[in-house]
Amino acid sequence: MDVNPTLLFLKVPAQNAISTTFPYTGDPPYSHGTGTGYTMDTVNRTHQYSEKGKWTTNTETGAPQLNPIDGPLPEDNEPSGYAQTDCVLEAMAFLEESHPGIFENSCLETMEVVQQTRVDKLTQGRQTYDWTLNRNQPAATALANTIEVFRSNDLTANESGRLIDFLKDVMESMDKEEMEITTHFQRKRRVRDNMTKKMITQRTIGKKKQRLNKRSYLIRALTLNTMTKDAERGKLKRRAIATPGMQIRGFVYFVETLARSICEKLEQSGLPVGGNEKKAKLANVVRKMMTNSQDTELSFTITGDNTKWNENQNPRMFLAMITYITRNQPEWFRNVLSIAPIMFSNKMARLGKGYMFESKSMKLRTQIPAEMLASIDLKYFNESTRKKIEKIRPLLIDGTASLSPGMMMGMFNMLSTVLGVSILNLGQKRYTKTTYWWDGLQSSDDFALIVNAPNHEGIQAGVDRFYRTCKLVGINMSKKKSYINRTGTFEFTSFFYRYGFVANFSMELPSFGVSGINESADMSIGVTVIKNNMINNDLGPATAQMALQLFIKDYRYTYRCHRGDTQIQTRRSFELKRLWEQTRSKAGLLVSDGGPNLYNIRNLHIPEVCLKWELMDEEYQGRLCNPLNPFISHKEIESVNNAVVMPAHGPAKSMEYDAFATTHSWIPKRNRSILNTSQRGILEDEQMYQKCCNLFEKFFPSSSYRRPVGISSMVEAMVSRARIDARIDFESGRIKKEEFAEIMKICSTIEELRRQK
């Protein structure tokens, strides 16, 4: 059927149609190949913005470093990173004056966190640069490798499991003359396969010891690995993002904890809250400005955009901010917090995989690793790449580029927000001392600025003053990309405000559909997404009902579980038809077993198993939810699980859904091809780690291994817990005498083995 799209909008207010203009349907673009070019762009741009700074050489690593701090004030509108220390400090002082005690209180909160955080905090997070293997690894593995290397180099502060003690090890490791590490390498050899008599390549994985001198170790400790940011919509060019190693992560975590604590107390900060809470916070600021602009005042809002926020920020500035914020605090605390910015002032950017060359005529492909870019003849490269390499060459050391100015993406979101808010804070009349004044919102690099003044000239003067004040601290408002409107219409972090926030529904589109975890989770996530959008995003009842029908259809096609009485033939239809015919109460069958859909928009909050439980045949119930059924993989399932859903912008967010352990909540097995690669050893370590943690959780159901278990080891803790539990069970008659004796015997054997070890 043909629909004239303009008809759809006849009854819709213009602001509600905004979401149709967003590039959020279909698959987002992914990057292919290496990120080396993007990383070189970042490094070169960052240096260009600070080019009038002073050059120095790092005495430890020999890396050339550019310091733009207190550099020349800009004379044009080009972006620049010449922040003035005294201006930043003054902005901090005024921020504290308007919020008495804010820094003091946040420091106290952070100090508590610093003393309590366990080192396993660092296992959260995705890919992490593993300096021992010089490539990315899952965070838990990278941490385990780091601790293992520290141990073998006589650094043992972190045995107690506090993050702060691990950081002491990091500091000590940097003073060592050399560090011995274990690296993995592959041996390939051609052997004849006994079965097929063909020649095959066999890979074996070896471990070898390697010594790093102080300089090499420092370079690795200060390295950020770079990748291309994937799935960015609405952009033509990709860009590089960084992942730091374990040495930097802990320090960054504490700085961000402090900054987060400050942001929570600032009404202009869009972080760390999100969703409806954020909307309420923003609406408050707007309301304040609109009520205060009496009939005599004009009020305008700028939907702001900053040019290259990260690349013009400077870690040295962050150091100045932290020094000021913590000025009355104990020495140890100030030291811990100042290390992150110091490390970032000396950071190195790893250039990634390098370039791939192929010769069409000779059908040859060859990889030029980043390490070779310093010496290779440039005639092989095209014009633009040649320029990049020439520019970056003076900065290269061992395949990494020295990058002192600038912050890589997403490292200090909270702290940079504090800096932005401190400028918004200066808009109060008592600081501007004229007829105009401003306020606004800041969330990392995104901002909205509301300016009030008696006339248009005043508005213009206010905007100019804000623009110039920002320049003093290295923030560059883009005049091309920011636009101004009467207050009441603006956009901030993809929230559109028009006398209240308009639901931008298109942003949620990517999270509709079947997630592909397993039949049980997918059903639950699918209906939860629809429910959440009815609550938060103006998804009306009719549209929700339609979304539900489309979802069920999509779900049935994905898992080939069409109703038992359908004519559609799939791989599963034979089994499902048989089940349908054998079942007395057909309404009790789950959708994934070919049953009917009983969901409507009123009962989306009920898990499907509960919805149909009373309708199920008894033997079906018994098969579906029997813990002894070998097909039910029971991870200890709490009543609530977390799924990762992909909204259209921003990071993947975690969404809670009700989880039910049935025969449908299977966990797919790991792809076997990994077992033949160099990752195999890592995989085994990871599984071992996983098994130990799972075992430990069985003994301590509250999974209290996040808290210190005192000085005893995990094994001792489990043995003593087993003894206590066994005694209680024996005395209450839950277990027999023989079982009790057997448990005690096993415990003694374990202790004996530990002694012998």
Swiss-Prot record:
The record's listing under InterPro entries reads: RNA-dir_pol_NSvirus, RNA_pol_PB1_influenza
Query: Where located?
Result: Host nucleus; Host cytoplasm
What Pfam families does the database record attribute to this sequence?
Answer: Flu_PB1 (PF00602)
Name a single GO biological process: symbiont-mediated suppression of host mRNA transcription via inhibition of RNA polymerase II activity
Looking at the record, the residues that make up the RdRp catalytic domain are: 286-483
Post-translation: what modifications? Phosphorylated by host PRKCA.
Key word Magnesium present: no
Q: Would you tell me the Gene Ontology cellular component terms?
A: host cell cytoplasm; host cell nucleus
Keyword annotations for this protein?
Eukaryotic host gene expression shutoff by virus, Eukaryotic host transcription shutoff by virus, Host cytoplasm, Host gene expression shutoff by virus, Host nucleus, Host-virus interaction, Inhibition of host RNA polymerase II by virus, Nucleotide-binding, Nucleotidyltransferase, Phosphoprotein, RNA-directed RNA polymerase, Transferase, Viral RNA replication, Viral transcription
Q: Which reaction does it catalyse?
A: RNA(n) + a ribonucleoside 5'-triphosphate = RNA(n+1) + diphosphate
Q: What is its main location?
A: host cell
Where is region (Promoter-binding site) located?
249-256
Q: Does the keyword Repressor apply?
A: no
Q: Where is the composition biased (Polar residues)?
A: 55-64
Subunit composition and interactions: Influenza RNA polymerase is composed of three subunits: PB1, PB2 and PA. Interacts (via N-terminus) with PA (via C-terminus). Interacts (via C-terminus) with PB2 (via N-terminus); this interaction is essential for transcription initiation.
- HAMAP family in alphabetical order: INFV_RDRP (MF_04065)
Q: Which family does it belong to?
A: Belongs to the influenza viruses polymerase PB1 family.
Q: What is this protein called?
A: RNA-directed RNA polymerase catalytic subunit
GN (gene name) = PB1
